[in-house]
Amino acid sequence: MATYYCAETGQASFLNFRETTPAEQTSLLDEHSQENKAFQIGVPGQTAGIYALWEQYGSMSWDQLLQPAIQLARQGYQVTPSLLGAIELIYGEMASHPELSEIYLRDGLPPRVGDVIQNEPLAQTLETIAQNGPSAFYQNLAQEIEMSVQSAGGYLTADDLLRYQPFAEHPATGTYRGYQIISSPYGGS
């Protein structure tokens, strides 16, 4: 989700690119969804949303915009106490997935504060998206994503990815102590 305000025109806009529910998922989350995390996977909108924002407001090339994220994934970042806490919280889950273990665990154990985490597969995916736009994610990788999610019990399909579109909405507005407040019409972080 993104709220944008143009000081020159005084106009505000809101772009919704939250995840959506897969078309084949007919029930809401229930007690079984806690056991099957893949059931909770929605249609991701981040890539399409950022691209739409870039098309409308961007001032650098798409490739330049993604370079810092590519560099961070490739060169890595240090484990902070808060990141370590998050990893320890889902350690059992991570340990059961070799792809996650290889990136986030050290010899099968949580990393230490100060260790560097590198994610070369993410760097390569971001490079592909930087070169080919969001279609690299929503079309080219769609079958691979579908197979991965469905093999784990989720509902996400390649067709869900292909159909995903961010959409514009009116932002929430109000006044507080003489200041105009412009925000998302939904709760979010």
Mark where each language-model region is:
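Noncatalytic scaffold domains of N-terminal-nucleophile
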Residues: 1-139, 143-187
